[in-house]
């Protein structure tokens, strides 16, 4: 397959370069990119690993695990500390100039304990462009992995210790914290006039609390916001399983979406990007029908979590983070996926301020999905997002 140069594919470069030097203004659908905030040291990892450890160590040291494996995947601009406003400024400006309308930051909270919040508080909100750029938060109700790279394949994929329990009081405290710190900001993303918040593991949230408990927690949080004069809430359920998807509307969620909706998690090791992306797009209307709520499509440029797993050689385990791996990913194919998602969002008949597309993600390098420049394709990933929007949306 044709490979793009460091500045992007020749097809993309023939398009007007002036588009990447100014903020694009779109008529309808908003495209929002998830942000993984784990690119700085934290005390918990300093104590568990070597001082200063971050997942950059995994990304930069990963080696091919099978013939043709595209590893390591290296950042063209080098490793960075996402608490540094200067490093964040450059990336936010790149998003602004290439059709990303806002960022959704993972917010790790476990009964008041927070980790990785400095990427948002110091890096993003500390940068001039960040302070004026739309953003929202996703409650990451799983704490970061305690062992990296993962070395045992006999343990649960999701360690029970990582799952974040909650109850009515804790959920209200979480929402109050987010509202007072972020919802009140002028640049905070609103959907239908309400502050946008998503829950990463909505299945665990509903399974743990039950339908009645989840409804009580969400109702109490909304009442707290109203009584405190804080912005009202638009709550999105991410990736609800078949077990709970019929409960999300009754619990009080307003919409459904996904984080990474690309691989078949129980499928073969190697899965083709074009096949998987097309199949997932056909599932979007089914998700909305099952949830009886608006569905906001999510697309990804790729998937390969190999950096998070130890090298088992030929005995590569058939499970996360070793498997599956998406192959054949390319900016041209991602451009098609973006155009398809934008067209779907527009065709759903929602009001313009409720038409959303999500991209996973801006920077989750250790899982192989990112828009930031890499050494294989240069700027072509984020240029593909821009050009996918051009293909599906008229400029104002």
Model-predicted regions and their roles:
Residues 24-90:
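N-terminal regions that are enriched for targeting/export leaders
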Residues 28-37, 43-46, 206-332:
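Aromatic-lined glycan-binding groove of carbohydrate-active enzymes
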Residues 33, 95, 193, 297, ...:
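Conserved, mostly hydrophobic/aromatic
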Residues 55, 126, 360, 368-396:
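Aromatic-rich peripheral "rim/lid" segments of glycoside hydrolase catalytic domains that contact
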Residues 71-85, 101-113, 155-169, 195-211, ...:
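The substrate-binding groove and active-site-proximal loops of carbohydrate-active enzymes
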Residues 87-137, 297:
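Aromatic-lined substrate-binding rim segments of carbohydrate-active enzymes
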Residues 132-136, 141-265:
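Active-site region of glycoside hydrolase catalytic domains
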Residues 325-376:
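Substrate-binding cleft of secreted/luminal carbohydrate-active enzymes
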């Amino acid at each position: 397959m044709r490979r793009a140069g460091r500045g992007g594919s020749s097809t993309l470069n023939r398009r007007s370069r002036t588009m990447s030097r100014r903020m694009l203004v779109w008529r309808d659908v908003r495209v929002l990119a998830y942000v993984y905030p784990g690119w700085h040291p934290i005390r918990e990892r300093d104590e568990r690993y070597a001082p200063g450890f971050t997942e950059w160590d995994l990304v930069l040291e990963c080696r091919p695990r099978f013939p043709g494996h595209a590893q390591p995947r290296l950042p063209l601009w080098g490793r960075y500390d996402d608490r540094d406003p200067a490093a964040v400024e450059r990336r936010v400006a790149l998003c602004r100039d290439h059709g990303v309308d806002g960022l959704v930051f993972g917010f790790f909270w476990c009964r008041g304990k927070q980790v990785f919040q400095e990427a948002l508080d110091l890096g993003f909100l500390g940068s001039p462009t960040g302070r004026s750029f739309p953003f929202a938060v996703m409650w990451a109700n799983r704490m970061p992995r305690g062992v990296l790279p993962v070395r045992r394949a006999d343990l649960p994929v999701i360690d029970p210790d990582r799952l974040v329990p909650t109850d009515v009081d804790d959920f209200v405290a979480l929402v109050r914290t987010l509202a007072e710190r972020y919802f009140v900001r002028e640049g905070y993303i609103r959907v239908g006039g309400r502050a946008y918040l998503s829950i990463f593991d909505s299945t665990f949230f509903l399974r743990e609390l039950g339908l009645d408990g989840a409804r009580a927690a969400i109702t109490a949080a909304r009442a707290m916001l109203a009584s405190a004069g804080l912005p009202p809430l638009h709550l999105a359920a991410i990736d609800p399983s078949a077990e709970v998807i019929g409960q999300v509307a009754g619990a009080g969620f307003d919409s459904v979406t996904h984080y990474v909706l690309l691989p078949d998690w129980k499928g073969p090791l190697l899965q083709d990007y074009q096949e998987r992306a097309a199949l997932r797009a056909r599932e979007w209307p089914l998700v909305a029908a099952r949830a009886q709520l608006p569905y906001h499509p999510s697309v990804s440029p790729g998937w390969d979590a190999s950096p998070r797993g130890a090298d088992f050689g030929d005995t590569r385990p058939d499970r996360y983070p070793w498997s599956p791996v998406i192959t054949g990913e390319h900016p041209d194919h991602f451009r098609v996926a973006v155009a398809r998602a934008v067209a779907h969002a527009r065709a759903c008949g929602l009001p313009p301020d409720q038409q959303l597309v999500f991209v996973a993600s801006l920077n989750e390098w250790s899982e192989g999905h990112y828009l930031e420049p890499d050494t294989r394709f240069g700027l072509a990933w984020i240029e593909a997002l821009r050009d996918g929007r051009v293909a599906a949306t008229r400029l104002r």
